[in-house]
């Protein structure tokens, strides 16, 4: 079994400095001490389960650099860098590109004019790339990736602005298994998932709003935000070990466990061979 490797960024400059999704409100900002404590707990939980965590250097003025999942898409030693829809996040790209270039990855960019927000909207389940579009990423970017990688890509239209990235409402657990929140997808998208993923564990609406689907999967361990008891029960029935880590300070910005991490060696659910 390969050693799991995950990229994270300490929340030294994290805060609610702008509003680019329905979760964010500058009038209800984050508490730095609580954010640091919650991030540290997630970090320690992952390390305690055998993960090697690589760290980005935080940058002043880039509060969302902490959400490394949006840096880009990793495929073997290729890194497809994100083109963010919002300028306030586009300033993160040079730092992510520099990190990946310095750590042995070939950094690539999608064609100009195509918005693409990385592993936030592009998740492998088996050999298939499931791709969220409309709110942040463009469907054209996923078509491009499918051609370059030689992989089947299944576009999924996101229709609920509170679930603006695919990783907020869909979490592959293993090839053919995933958590999802049906209410984030249109009828066609729900049908696509039901057809192509053998086992789907639906998240209750209240737990979906706790970002229960925004989970980190390491083998049979699934790390979620707190307040997702029914989802945890379903995971245990499937043979997984759910672990709850309070991440409410990051929910204020529309993020949770998965948003705070980027797998560098391929998700356990991904089949790249």
Each model region followed by its residue ranges:
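The feature marks the mature, well-folded catalytic cores of soluble enzymes
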Residues: 1-273
């Amino acid at each position: 079994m390969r050693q799991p490797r995950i990229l994270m960024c300490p929340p030294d400059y994290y805060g609610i400095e702008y509003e680019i999704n329905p979760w964010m409100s500058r009038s209800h900002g984050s508490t730095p001490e609580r954010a640091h404590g919650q991030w540290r707990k997630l970090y320690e939980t992952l390390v305690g389960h055998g993960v090697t965590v690589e760290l980005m250097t935080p940058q002043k003025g880039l509060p969302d650099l902490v959400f490394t999942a949006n840096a880009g898409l990793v495929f073997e030693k290729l890194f497809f860098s994100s083109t963010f829809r919002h300028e306030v996040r586009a300033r993160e790209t040079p730092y992510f590109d520099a990190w990946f270039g310095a750590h042995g990855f070939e950094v690539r960019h999608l064609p100009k004019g195509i918005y693409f927000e990385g592993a936030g909207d592009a998740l492998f389940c088996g050999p298939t790339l499931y791709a969220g579009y409309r709110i942040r990423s463009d469907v054209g970017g996923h078509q491009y990736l499918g051609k370059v990688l030689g992989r089947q890509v299944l576009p999924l239209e996101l229709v609920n602005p509170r679930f603006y990235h695919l990783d907020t409402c869909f979490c592959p657990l293993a090839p053919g298994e995933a958590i999802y929140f049906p209410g984030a997808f249109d009828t066609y998208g729900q049908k696509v998932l039901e057809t192509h993923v053998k086992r789907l564990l639906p998240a209750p609406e209240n737990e979906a709003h706790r970002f229960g689907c925004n989970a980190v999967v390491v083998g049979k361990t699934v790390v979620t935000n707190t307040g997702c008891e029914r989802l945890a029960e379903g995971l245990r029935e499937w043979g997984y070990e759910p672990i709850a880590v309070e991440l409410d300070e990051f929910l204020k910005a529309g993020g949770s466990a998965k948003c705070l991490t980027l797998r560098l060696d391929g998700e356990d659910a991904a089949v790249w061979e």
